[in-house]
Amino acid sequence: MGSKGKKGKSSEVNLETSKNKEKNIKGKKKNSLDPIEKNKQETAGLQTTSRPTAKQLVGGSSWTGKIPVVLLNEHCQRSKWEKSDVKVRQTKSKNYIFTSVVLAKKDPKNPSILDHVSLIPPKSYYENGYFPEKETLVEARNVGAVYALHRIMSHKSLQHALPPEHRNIWFDMEKQKKEELKNKHSWLYNEDPFKAAKELQAARASSAAKPPPKASQKNEKVSLTSIKNTSLSHFSKFNFKYALPIHMSLENRRSLENLFRNMNTWDILEDTKNLEPDTSIVNDLISLGFRDIHAKEACQYCVSLEDALEWLIIHVPEDDLPTRFLPSDYTTGISVQNLNSANLAIHYNAKRISETGYSFDLCFSTLQTFENNIQISSEYLQQHLIGESFDGNISLEPNSTEWDDDVSALQSILDNKVSKIENGCRVRIDYPTSEFGELFVDFRRPARSYPAHIPLMSLSSTKRMASYIKLSILKKMVVYAMDLRGECMLSWLYNHLQENIEDFLQNIGSLLNISAATIGVSLSSQNKSAPTAKKNNSFKPKLFRRSRELSEKLCNNWSERVKSPSYQLKVREREKLPAWESRRKIMDAIQHSQVVVISGETGSGKSTQVVQFILDHYLSSGEKDLQTVVCTQPRRISAISLAERVAFERDTTVGKEVGYSVHGEKSISKETLLEFCTTGLLLRRIQQHGLGFLSTLSCVVVDEVHERSIENDILLTLLKLVISRIPNLKVILMSATVNSDTFKYYFGNAGHLHIHGRTFPIKDYYIEDFAPKLNEDDDEEDVPRRKKKEYEIDYHLISRLVSSIDAELGSSSGSILVFLPGVSNIARCIREIKSKDGSKFEVLPLHASLNTSEQRRCFKTYTKRKIICATNIAETSITIDDVVAVIDSGRVKQIDYDVERDLVTFKETWASRAACQQRRGRAGRVKKGICYKLYTRGFEEKGMLGQTPPEVLRTALSQVCLNVVPLVKRFSSAGNSVNQGSIKKFMNSLIDPPNDATVDLALKKLIQVGALTVSEDLTGLGEYLVSLPIDLKLGKLLVFGSIFGYLEPALTITAILSTKSPFLGDDEAREIRSKQSQGWGDVLADARVYHNWLEILETRGVKKTVQWCEEMHLHYTTLQQIRQNRNELSEAAQLLELTTKKLTGNFDWYSTENLTVLSTLIAAALSPNVVKCVYPDKKFVASFSGSLEMEQEARLTKFYDQNNQRLFIHPSSTMFVNSPNASRCTFVAYEQKVETTKPFLRNCTPINTYGMILLGANDILIDPLGKGLILDQAYCIKAWPKVVILLKMLKRCLDASLHERLESSSGLNYESEIHQCIRTLIAGNGV
């Protein structure tokens, strides 16, 4: 890029036209040869055996192609131009460098005329070293030829025809071209430089001929010194020509103003109380039209021009704002509303009183209180102005002679200055300026007796005077009058005002002192606290450090317990486990290495015994400061069942020496020395307390590391980073199928030990072995079918297989474990088994969604044979002792990342061979077992993966990076902030790090959705999303739905988006879906249908519901899956306790207000997947009642993304045929973008402008000086400055409430008011 100013122009094109004869041209060419002859002489003077050719000088001895000058002249010849002329000059170092390239061509109408174009590179090209100095003229001219070739032929890959050195120059020019195109200098690279030069010259001439626009006060450009290097200084680059306009009603403006004033957002700055305000800010505010006293007052609360502008626009009444901050059509007065006859009279009187300066809302409410009595209401307002109490239970008192006498006396003194008005008189006041025209003060009889009570006073003028100025003067008059009570005072009041009017006008007083009267709020409300959080008194866990006395007590208790017969009996049972034989080796390895990897086969007892060996070692060694041993498990049920088993083996109860902690449940005490917990819980503790927590532990045992979950990988990375700082901390990694080399290499010098298992023989049966016996047609030919996505589990086959196994076992005890992929599969399988032999079996589900008590049922003994239908939760850790047979479907629901939909999903797929081996091992724990596999031998060998890929490599990294942020923050060097780049550095340190590009995309998405700041700190929303175990977009929808009181519909929509539309794909289904939409888009149409289906199912039964689904072209199974997903999401939302307000009654799916807000919440969740709508020009048709606007076709509406690329609605969308309503649809949110013949948008939802501003946009740039807002650096919104400031502050309050909602269950003061304002603005689009 070129430098700024004249030298900074990207290039200089000079178009010269001259009339020269052919002989002159030839003479010029002849002269141009002189430097070449000179160069020949210089070359000849070299003491060499042979003189190099031009090709050898330019391209080297091995170059066989053409040199750049030849290529340029050949192009000129083909284009019928004259031969190029490369200008060269000699440098101080006696070398040569080219300065420009002159191209010429004959005028086709007059061949004697030549047009010239000079291609001159900017100075910065030389400063950056793009054009090196050359020893000879020939070499310098060829460098210039490359520049000229790039200017006119950069659209071609000409670099391949250039010598190697000149290719590099071409590549440098390509980089510069990208910058020039960004700066809209595309004319530089026109194939025809003569045409480009003429167009540029014409454009410059046209621009110079245009008269400068007339400046108005509103649009007058003001030079502000205090906004340099702020967001205001970068606002001019956006084009507001086609900006979307927004409006905000007077009622909504007042609601927001009252909210912000009541919140007392601005506290006076302690360090500015006794200091002069910033002169530059004050001067800038004055230049913008604000009063000097107001500017100085604003600086008491603000330290920047932007903040001061906000303060002033909120606190200065609209009728005193500078005109640049008001819309062109702004008029003072009261908005017209639909009023009944009673309220109409009050409305009229309120308008009369408000002309004296009081807020119309305050006047209206006061008149309502005092039954539309003007005198009593006016007296109340006057007392309210100075904060005096007022007894409203008064009646009008009879007229007294004192009032009439005082009025007459005043009239006799002032003569023609006094005129009579109703119930009083009006007196003209003289003052030195004419700013307000003629100034008058009105004195009216009070409602109570005079002179015991002061008269009613008001100011008026022939020119506009701001309400707050009137009230400021009036307040001083009322205070003065209060000291005159009991004597006639009109003349005193007049004299006081006349003598001090100049001082009153110059020293108007603080804006805040009279805010009660101008905005209609009580003085007490101004004293409310700032938006601090209502902190709850809930217990916040603190670090627990065990005292020496307690440690000695625990050691003594253990010493006594190990001597008991019951303990010894259990030890003898433990000695039968293979792990016991390796006890000494295990402890030796742990003592000699800080990190030890222990692998053990199924049944070895590693999960129950290793932790006990470690605990017994510390207890027997007489440690004075006993520290806790923590063992992590991937699942809640694993942690609980292991804690119960180990507590039993140690002859104690759970919660004492051995305990557990899982999400929502724990059983630990001060005596707990061995704690089983989930990996996520341990990560949260580390996040809370960092190294302080880890220093309270003696050992961290990470079990089931082979599963390679994200939480396990993150935990291992954290431990690797901190173990060098906590040398006494031991780290043990355990698994049945662990690749020890991977972890040994990762931790450097980690020790390793393998424990052989104790399992009974297991007989394997593949589907080709048992299917024929069960009369099922399933053999090797089914392998291709099973590989397909549409493969479905044969539940009938499982049911018959269960009956067959039961018959084979006969009277032998033992349960059957069936592995299935998901919850819905389990439910269907249970129904199938119960429908066949339900009375013979105790059929139980086992999956992570069940609560602890339901999961524990699987470990109990029953009189009937136990059939357990489980997910992969039962593969490891959980041991159901009486399992003798396993039925393996081979399927698993696995986290996967759908790139096209940008959605994290639980996708059903084939399990790995390692996982199936773990399932098989469940059958041989107590005796010989059998394993039935619902797949063939060939498919197991060829169709299954050997190992399940690490979760970090098969999920959306945006979610992973978000979860990493709090942990990186805890261990960052800055302490309170995450250093930019820390997240990527952490991700690169994982066992299997993802590539940098993937992490960059993830971080970019987090910033776009509003979860991270640019500096990689969590926003308020981000703190919520960290706690939600679902995809970002769906989590965002649940958060906003919960906070705004729309949790129930948000759960439905989240479930639909995580599944798919329940409609079939035929044309009839599209038509029905379009009717259900009613212009509200695809997602809300699906949600409506789901709730209709649910209502019919509950009222009419399954049979009628299935018939209804067929009529509506709905997929019944999909609707069931949506319901299942919704139930699971509902449980997750309840655990987070996010709800701040619940809607009363059932959600109305046909309420315009509800659907407007709900569609905005959807857009907030899908952001930044939002496009702008551009409607065609309106067309009208004549009718008997006048011109009517024609309804436009949907296809005429255009949609543009942030990059101004046009996108199209997919034909399957309801918005493809239904033209959106322009009044409620200025933007469209979409779930998925696909590209076939065009880029299409699927699952669209329309939103209005206010919805986009408040919730749909993640980045908002505002210009309080007059233009409006920029959403996401792309969409321009035109609004008058006061509305801009109000919206900015509302967005700020929303983010603050999100932050506080996570910190405190009570949240912010005024939180409900903030959310109500947002709902109101979105529902009415500001009106």
Curated annotation (Swiss-Prot):
PANTHER family per UniProt: ATP-DEPENDENT RNA HELICASE, ATP-DEPENDENT RNA HELICASE YLR419W-RELATED
Alphabetical keyword list: ATP-binding, Cytoplasm, Helicase, Hydrolase, Nucleotide-binding
Designated name of the protein: Putative ATP-dependent RNA helicase ucp12
Domain Helicase C-terminal: start-end pairs: 797-968
Reported function: Probable ATP-binding RNA helicase.
Short sequence motif named DEAH box, residue ranges: 703-706
Region (Disordered): 1-58, 201-222
Residue span, RWD domain: 405-504
Binding-site residues for ATP, renumbered to this chain: G600, E601, T602, G603, S604, G605, K606, S607
Catalytic reactions of this protein: ATP + H2O = ADP + phosphate + H(+)
Domain Helicase ATP-binding: 587-756
Residues of the UBA domain: 276-315
Gene: ucp12
